[in-house]
Amino acid sequence: MNNSEKIDFPVQVAEGIYWVGSHEQGTHLYCNPYLIVVDDKAILIDGGSRSDFARVMMKILQVGIDPKDIVALIYQHYDPDLCGSVSNLIDICENPDIKVLSTRDDKTFISFYLQKNRFRLIENIEDYGNTFTLNKRTLRFIPTPYAHTNGSFVTFDAQTKTLFSSDLFGSFSYYKENIFFDLAPQCYTCTTLEKCPDGKEYCPILAMDQFHRKIMPCEKALHYAMSQIKKIEIDTIAPQHGNILYRRKDIDFFIDRLGSLDKVGIDGML
Ligand SMILES: [Fe+2]
Ligand SMILES: [Fe+2]
């Protein structure tokens, strides 16, 4: 049984925030779009790939949101695993005023997912002062350049202290039993990640190290992103891949770990 069969329903992450993701069959990449519900309206963050579209939409309906009430689609960078379904989403939302929000730099590439007559729907978060407010709920956008695209950013919901971190804090793998992170007490001081002292097959710390070494371009970009994230008081980190971090101890641990991770991208090759 794969994970999408195990968790075939939306999962509440924080007040008004729902995981509406699925497991990409045939890969280990577990994609996590998130729906933020404010009164009877909603915002979708990193909406998912084309092949995820039907499953994501099913979960949005299960939350009780009519697609017509989605007012904004936020894309924290331009990769196909989060942007692939943008055209399908615009079609099904049938909202002529829907906004597709991203950075000026990422907009260049996101436009390639759309027909020309829809380019006007893409708006720059910079033009909103790096914030977006829906019925008094304000999301703040924090630039994390080159982590991993030039226009990458993360999104902070002050009301629930949730950080939507896109590829940051992601993993290629995930706990199969649960979408939430579950680090054992002895893991924080473990020095033999390649060979788990407890005999477990999956090491979530190693998985996160490997993901960032592969996906991020260099140490400087990753360390800078962590220095910006460290300034924020966060209760939950909701990444686009892997598991959701919800314990302060785990959040601090991984901010510090990724903030000094070596052999990242080109730095691990030269
Ligand atoms: Fe990406
Ligand atoms: Fe991704």
Q: Where are the language model's segments positioned?
A:
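Metallo-beta-lactamase
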Residues: 12-13, 101-239, 244-246
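Active-site neighborhood of phospho(di)ester-bond hydrolases with catalytic His/Asp-centered motifs
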Residues: 45-47, 69-78, 100-104, 163-166, ...
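Short, flexible loop segments at the rims of nucleotide/cofactor-binding pockets, characterized by
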Residues: 19-25, 76-78, 139-145, 213-217
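Short, glycine/acidic-enriched loop or turn micro-motifs at the edges of active sites
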Residues: 49-50, 80, 170, 244
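Conserved beta-strand hairpin/beta-sheet module of binuclear metal-dependent hydrolase folds
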Residues: 3-63, 154-157, 161-165
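Binuclear metal-ion centers of metallo-dependent hydrolases, dominated by the metallo-beta-lactamase
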Residues: 233-270
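Active-site metal-binding motif and surrounding structural segment of the metallo-beta-lactamase
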Residues: 52-100
